[in-house]
A protein has these predicted regions:
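Mature-chain termini and adjacent capping regions
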Residues: 1-163
Length: 163
């Protein structure tokens, strides 16, 4: 199995948490990214349906800077087998290992072309938590490369004083 598409998917995941607080230095130590799940259904033959990889059951991404867990994660591929979008569903939690931020959502979609992470409400609002604030909204849109956040729908911010 060609692991290049899966490695590209891990880039998406690493950008999720990077959006919360920029790293002062890139991950120069290399390190290993491990994606585990109970099952993986990978289809790169477009004649047999959409080109995608579907991770199901206790999905966990462990990367030097963060961890992500969800119940399911789908990686969608373009004609050239590059990753177009990644979608994590059900109890999506992303935590930086340095403890500076985390996100919680029922659905998270990362668009590779737009470099945009969207946290979506299914039945409850997603939230993005940093050391001094928590943001809740029907939709939270993060742009990792621009250190920018937008919200849509009902939104609120809770500010906490630093200890």
């Amino acid at each position: 199995m060609n692991l290049l598409p899966l490695l590209a998917a891990t880039f998406w995941v690493s950008s999720l948490v990077y959006a919360q607080t920029p790293d002062p230095a890139p991950n120069a130590g290399g390190g290993q990214t491990v994606i585990t799940s109970e099952t993986l259904d990978l289809n790169l033959n477009k004649t047999k349906g959409p080109k995608q990889g579907l991770f199901r059951g206790n999905v966990k991404v462990d990367e030097p800077r963060f961890t992500m867990v969800s119940k399911e994660m789908t990686v969608f591929f373009a004609e050239d087998d590059s990753v177009e979008n990644v979608e994590a569903r059900e109890e999506v939690v992303i935590k930086r290992k340095d403890g500076t931020s985390e996100t919680w959502s029922e659905k998270a979609v990362y668009n590779m072309k737009e470099k945009k992470l969207t946290l979506l409400k299914v039945t409850k609002q997603p939230k993005a938590i940093s050391q001094d604030k928590t943001v809740f909204a029907d939709k939270i849109i993060l742009f990792p490369e621009e250190d920018k956040m937008l919200t849509e729908g009902a939104s609120r911010v809770m500010l906490q004083k630093a200890p």
